[in-house]
Amino acid sequence: MRCDNNYSFSILFSLLLILILDSKVVSLSTSCQSKSVCGNINIPYPFGIEKGCYLNEWYKIECKNATYPFLFKMGMAVVNISLPGDDGYNNPVSYGSIRVKIPITSIGCSRDGKESGSVLNFTDSPFYFGIGNSLVAVGCNSKASLTNINPSKVGCELNCTASKETLPSKSIPFFDKTGCSNNKLPYYSSLCTKNNGEDERSCDGNGCCIAGLLDSEAPQVIGINIESFDHGNSTKLECRVAFLTDDVSPFSNASEPKRLFAKRYATVSLGWVIQTKNLSFVNSLSCKNTKEYDNSTYNIKLVTSCICNNVTISGTDYANCGCSQGYEGNPYLPGGCKDINECLRNSYGQRQNCRESDTCVNLPGTFNCIGNKTRVTMIGVGSAFGILVLVVGIWWLRKFLKKRRMSKRKRKFFKRNGGLLLQQQLNTNKGNVEKTRIFSSRELEKATDNFSESRILGQGGQGTVYKGMLVDGRTVAVKKSKVVDEDKLEEFINEVVILSQINHRHVVKLLGCCLETEVPTLVYEFIPNGNLFQHIHEESDDYTKTWGMRLRIAVDIAGALSYLHSAASSPIYHRDIKSTNILLDEKYRTKVSDFGTSRSVTIDHTHWTTVISGTVGYVDPEYYGSSQYTDKSDVYSFGVVLVELITGEKPVITVSNSQEIRGLADHFRVAMKENRFFEIMDARIRDGCKPEQVMAVANLARRCLNSKGKKRPCMRKVFTDLEKILASQEDSLVNIENDDGADDEEEGMTMINIDDSQTIYVTAPAPSIVASSSSSDVQPLFPHPTWI
């Protein structure tokens, strides 16, 4: 085949199709391949010797003595098995053939003179008589004919004379001698030859005659009959033989019938196909049928390796398959048809020749001859493709190295940000720590728009909080810590561990953390309504202006701190209680947050000894002097928050008369001592509040702000008292009596009378009981710097 330069783009397209060809090849097992030869005869699939190596029993070959193959179900010796296209014609719809030995029919050759022979019957099998077979009769004065086929009269007549010229052949042809012109089958036999009018007088009726078995609809039943006519010239019955064969070249008038009878067999060519009762096998071949192939485009035909055609033999449907033009191999194996490299040889075994100035290029199913100009174009295209592959390779390598570098950095950050310490803490607290999710840095960057400034919710001494949205739709608060040195990583890990231990409705929930970034990051549940400081000290028109809501908030805070101090798995000191760390949700429910400086202590310890940390106005003055932080230090900070709720003032105020800057706690204690409480009471809560109730809370706040920690009530006591105050009925008369003689260093008794039915006494622990606490109160623990 020769193509000009206009097919350049077709070549490129075909080369592309090579890359997308299905590479799946279902091959027989190694055991089947090693047993695919019997003697010197190849046994191709669907035929096979061992079980599992043949399609079904019709194709089973019995190899006797490892030398002689037999068609097991038919009991016939096999001479050769060929696949479609093995003849070299490479016709995609030719049939496979199997040559077998059949008995010779004779009369007058045996001692009893009886006729021998049998009817050959292949009904319901995948085998039929091929169109390359001929009826050969040898002897004198007889007629040989075929039976069980249409037309019914098929045969030839034998006469013996001294001269060939005086007696023409009496052959009665069934088809024309050549077997091509009247063929009605949709395929051609590999043994079909054209009649060129040559003189074929070697077996012409004088002692030998031939009738071609042609133009039949693939007969499966054939018998042979020999009829003698001696015309009374002899009383002795001479030997005569007749048989079907696919090879007539050895026979001539000189052949002796007794010699042929002694041979006892002749070879006949049988065509074989595949029964289509079960289409699963044919469909598994992925071959196109002839109709699909004929309707396909040229490029599709080039990459179609095999074709199957449906035929009907004796009323039964069969299929025969073959490798398409430009392919060779076994069409009955998936992927068994392979492309022929026409630049080395074509389907006829010859090498394709291009001009010396051209280059032969093999293509799927064909080839092309490329001229010099086209070659330059192809070189250019190939070079461009190579450069593209190089660029893509460099890009991929760069991406791989970058990803590897980022992975290495993430591991470095994980270690630097305390990942190993966190794992150790989580393992130490196993069973007490709820499983914390580890977020990837990419996930948090996506959730916060790369930590956009527009997503900032607030900033503090420990870091910046961003609003984010996870892929599952949850809104979260992402706390990105400030850059810290390794000496301060313990505080960050401490916050993760502490929050993992806490499970309380009034404590903000930790969802997870990320340690892959340069600075550590925490992910909390999002609390949408801001913090308590904003609601108290900034102009707003909401429920926090009412005393009932403020009292409810105070109870919630006290409940959370009481849980941290006594109900958690181990006591936890918050160490930074302030109104900005009290968050409110959309229903004004309280959430205590920011545990960066929190500490967890064992049950037999009552304090931490550490470097001073906290927020001005909230820090326990006793903590300043001793550096020992106890649960009563949290009580003091809570007392300041109570005063904020009562007065509406900030924790550090400027006295209007003297312009003196004073802590709110000191200002409150002075006002209470001078009985000026109602002067400092927030005007926004006066309307609608119960003064006795407010006074009861004020006295409780005063006790929380006692300068001596041991005289302050514990958080559980504070929580209980606030719940009782909140539970007082609106029509109840609440009377507060306080020992005015008690100084700031002593604890008085506060009595709250509610109606006539119940009396509640709120009392601090006696000094003698407080003094009897464990000696561990003064045992210093390991100090550590804070993030403040």
From Swiss-Prot:
MF (Gene Ontology): ATP binding; calcium ion binding; polysaccharide binding; protein serine kinase activity; protein serine/threonine kinase activity
Annotated catalysed reactions: L-seryl-[protein] + ATP = O-phospho-L-seryl-[protein] + ADP + H(+); L-threonyl-[protein] + ATP = O-phospho-L-threonyl-[protein] + ADP + H(+)
Pfam family membership, one: Pkinase
Transmembrane segments: 376-396
Annotated glycan sites: 65, 80, 121, 159, 233, 253, 278, 295, 310, 372
Alphabetical UniProt keywords: ATP-binding, Disulfide bond, Glycoprotein, Kinase, Membrane, Nucleotide-binding, Phosphoprotein, Serine/threonine-protein kinase, Signal, Transferase, Transmembrane, Transmembrane helix
Family membership noted in the UniProt record: Belongs to the protein kinase superfamily. Ser/Thr protein kinase family.
Notes on the domains: The EGF-like region is specific to this family of proteins and seems to consist of the C-terminal of an EGF-like domain fused to the N-terminal of another one.
Protein name (database record): Putative wall-associated receptor kinase-like 11
Protein's organism: Arabidopsis thaliana (Mouse-ear cress)
Lineage: Eukaryota, Viridiplantae, Streptophyta, Embryophyta, Tracheophyta
Primary gene name: WAKL11
